[in-house]
């Protein structure tokens, strides 16, 4: 009998509304937090980027049909957008497609047109490996060989 009461008490505490609430005291705190994160970015821009990425993947599959091993691993949209001119973008894209035996000029021109409507993805600046002191040789006198 006492065990039943104890079991009911534990069960009722586990099912209490205060336990069901997420962070911030709201019942669906996790969902609301995700909603705030996605609202932070422009959904249209993200959708455009996704559409361009899907288009790139589809076209690369067409261009490299039967020679998938030669297909570039990635066409980095942000890397292309960081380049200063359309000529540089064109050279970069053509360089990625050097191994393609099919004509690529239509793909290059269409991709350049699609890139004109996109903006670089906002994010945290990526430090250069040369900026990281942990990657440079140690300058500790105890570990430096005498001249």
Swiss-Prot record:
Keyword annotations: Cytoplasm, Phosphoprotein, Protein phosphatase inhibitor
Repeat recorded as keyword: no
Cellular component terms per the entry's GO annotation: cytoplasm
Sequence segments annotated as region (Disordered): 1-37, 118-147
Gene Ontology MF terms: protein phosphatase inhibitor activity; protein serine/threonine phosphatase inhibitor activity
InterPro entries to which the protein is assigned, alphabetical: CPI-17, CPI-17_sf
Entry's localization field: Cytoplasm
A Pfam match: PP1_inhibitor
UniProt entry tagged with the keyword Phosphoprotein: yes
Chain positions found as Phosphothreonine: 38
Listed GO biological process terms: cellular response to xenobiotic stimulus
Phosphoserine, modified sites: 26, 128, 134, 136
Basic residues bias locations: 1-11
Positions of the UniProt region annotated as Inhibitory: 35-120
Record-stated family: Belongs to the PP1 inhibitor family.
Function: Inhibitor of PPP1CA. Has over 1000-fold higher inhibitory activity when phosphorylated, creating a molecular switch for regulating the phosphorylation status of PPP1CA substrates and smooth muscle contraction.
Name assigned to this protein: Protein phosphatase 1 regulatory subunit 14A
Gene that this polypeptide is encoded by: Ppp1r14a
